[in-house]
Amino acid sequence: MTKNIKYLTRNAKLVCAADFFGNLGRTFPHAILTIFLLEQGFDLVQIATLQSVFMIVAMVTEFPSGIWADLFGRKQIYMAAVVTLFCSYLLIGFFSDHFIVILFAYVLYGLSVALKSGTLEAEVVLEFEKEQRDIKAYSVASSYVMSISSIVGGLLGSLFYEKMHSYMYAISLMLFVLAFLMAALCVFSQTSGQKEREQRHLRDELKVGFCVLKSSKPLLYMILLFASATLFVQPFFQYWQVLYQQGGIPVRYFGIIYVAFQACNLVGTMIYNRMKMSNKKIMIFVWLIAIIFAFSMINTQLALFLLPVSVILFYVFYQHLDVLQKKVAPKQFMSSFFSLVGTSENIASIVSLFIMATCIEYVGITYAYIILFFMFSVCTYICYLLFLKDK
């Protein structure tokens, strides 16, 4: 990790610092968010409504936010995202007496996630390409930063909630200020292409962007690869608690298990960083994800151990996919492309959750996991072969 950080440019280090403080502030009260809202008097239906509003706002605004970033400046949009997140947490932490206020806070929360997508990250990628640096180093360092901040935030939030309650949000607000300052210190050179785009209207930007996407099959296959990844991600994140509860694991250990799953990201990133990846190895990892978990058919208890193994293998693949995305993204529409990928993931997530829920109803959660993981492996294998063919 230290080696990767040292290799980064000044701007890349500042972006990593901004992401670290921003994600730490976001996750600090995140582990106890449901408990906090319940204690404020909201019921589970209202909490589900808040989550739905968050997802809808993030999905609807993500692609437009990428276009805004390409048109008006990625640094400015990133800083706007931090300010929006600051306002959201301020309302949640200190003005949570009324449901309408919290609902508006979740609208801001979803908007902040959308605004952040493909902003300073795209600037760093362009800077690395200009200086002919290895994008993998930045991608790995960024993954380490996000994983560590999530783990630290989740642990500290769980430990300090009983003593601090809503004051945890005050710490988050201070961390957001640090993230804003780190982003403000970034200085990126403006290319001639950026100056030309500033003179174009939003409609023209959309028209040209879709023409670029239509004429490039690798970009389309890259979007499909990220959409296929939701066949693994959504069942894992949304249903692992159910799987472990049915396996006899007490709920009181779920906080520790959550942190352990975050650590799986770190392990997967380490493996990817240390291994020289070939297309053949990546395909082996993709198939192993489903094949290894399929052994849980032998014993339900075995699934509790095999799921983390599958998660580690997935993160190895996903890290590789993230690097590929940064390499093939069109320079003139990088933020728009990153946001379009995020939008496709959001839509695919809804489909994945529907498939998972249907499978659980008919075959049970263990077999549902196996079905979804094999669907992920098959779809990813086909899309990856098509991507390599037209690359």
Please give the residue ranges for each predicted region.
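Helix-loop boundary and gating motifs at the non-cytosolic
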Residues: 2-60, 216-259
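Cytoplasmic helix-loop-helix junction between adjacent transmembrane helices
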Residues: 107-147
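Helix-loop junctions on the cytosolic side of multi-pass membrane transporters
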Residues: 169-172, 176, 180-199, 385-391
